[in-house]
Amino acid sequence: MNDQVDLLFFAAHADDIELSCGGTIAKSVRDGLRVGLVELTRGEMGTRGTPQIRYRESQRAAKILGVEFRYQLDFGDGGLRTGRDEELELIEVVRRHTPRVVFAPWPDERHPDHVRTGRICTDASFYAGLRSLQTSRPAHRPQVTAYYLQNYVLHPTFVVDVTAAWKTKMRAIAAFKSQFHDPKSKSKSKSKDPVIFISDPKFLGMIEARAKHFGALIGVEYGEAFVTKQPPKLDDIIAAYEGREP
């Protein structure tokens, strides 16, 4: 495992990352960037599957995406803890992996665990840069915290073209067989798990529709949207809008 990464993605639960930014991860890996994934909970409050099943599925998805590592913390699902102990643990994670960019959920999402994840990851990324805050590793502050979108649609700060990585993203999502509808399944037996919003056959169609919407904003087939609290720097204005019409 390579501890140092360029991009570090945080999520509350396994599969949050694939749904929101799996294409960006796959594209970044193809572009030669080192990527790591960290979930803050084991998903023990999930309606479908078990923590053990979801962990195995997450590791299969990680191999499909080609990331350097993926592991879980244990901040408590369905009431994610955000005290000082958890904050210090995340500070240590950021200092250990020295990412240039941290990704986290937008901190005003529908699910309370997503809200708390976005907020504590934002705070920890900042505090990780304080030299006076001593831990077992030296201070490190990422260049920016970028927020991915889940339930709510916001005006994006930037959109990543994930058209070439779309099939990889969907393969990674399909690794979570306990969570989502599998249109290719030939099994006639019905799952004993309850049907929920994300296991409905229409759900993955919604994910694709959203990606097509964000892709249309930048003139491509599929896009994934992100929000930052400060605008990015552009070195080439023409290239940034290539293939677009006013």
Regions inferred by a protein language model and the residue ranges of each:
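Metal-dependent de-N-acetylase/amidase catalytic core
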Residues: 1-8, 84-246
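Active-site rim/loop-helix segments in enzyme catalytic domains that contact anionic ligands
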Residues: 1-97, 227, 239-245
